[in-house]
Regions:
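...captures the hydrophobic TM-helix bundle architecture rather than a specific catalytic motif
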Residues: 1-185
């Protein structure tokens, strides 16, 4: 984040950054924000195992479900930490091998940042059968559906980029088309 903020080329505004750079910014924000929850869970489980604490040990009054919440609160955004740079690479490859500029650049950036904004509120869809209160099912179901909107912005940009392009079918382009196809089905 600091590198992009302070060491951009002279005259390069935020609106002219390559989409791959935006995808790395998005992944970096997620890593910076959510990794500390994983570290806290690891510290708590270490204290349970070594020092006799009982954060997660039900026999001693701990809450095993708390570990599951903390685990998924980190692990679901971690999926996006891994996939967002891949989205950026895919969009760059599609633009290059379609011989066109990226379609709807600002919408693609908004999609990447929208995924970042929503990724912290979808973790509990992994926990519908683990004892979570029933009244929480609907909000997490809705958040799971809503996160598809910014993802749709990213893939609309991908499809718009290849539309009417002079497509050059080489190995990177075939791989990028495979990524788009897999995320669209």
């Amino acid at each position: 984040l600091v590198t992009v903020t302070h060491l951009r080329a002279p005259g390069m505004s935020w609106g002219r950054l390559p989409i791959f750079v935006w995808s790395v910014i998005a992944a970096s924000i997620l890593a910076f924000t959510f990794t500390q929850f994983f570290a806290a869970a690891m510290l708590m489980i270490t204290l349970d195992r070594i020092a006799g604490f009982s954060f997660f040990n039900a026999d001693k009054g701990g809450a095993p479900l708390l570990y599951q919440h903390i685990f998924w609160f980190y692990s679901h955004p971690a999926v996006y930490i891994f996939v967002l740079p891949g989205f950026g690479i895919t969009l760059e490859v599609l633009a290059h091998f379609s011989r066109k500029p990226l379609f709807a650049y600002r919408w693609a950036v908004a999609g990447l940042l929208g995924i970042v904004a929503l990724s912290g509120v979808v973790w509990a869809h992994h926990m519908f059968v683990s004892g979570m209160p029933t009244w929480l099912h609907a909000p997490f179901l809705v958040s799971t559906e809503v996160i598809s909107v910014p993802t749709g912005f990213v893939f609309l940009s991908a499809l718009g980029t290849i539309w009417m392009g002079r497509i050059w079918l080489r190995t990177p382009m075939l791989f990028a088309l495979g990524v788009v196809f897999n995320f669209m089905i």
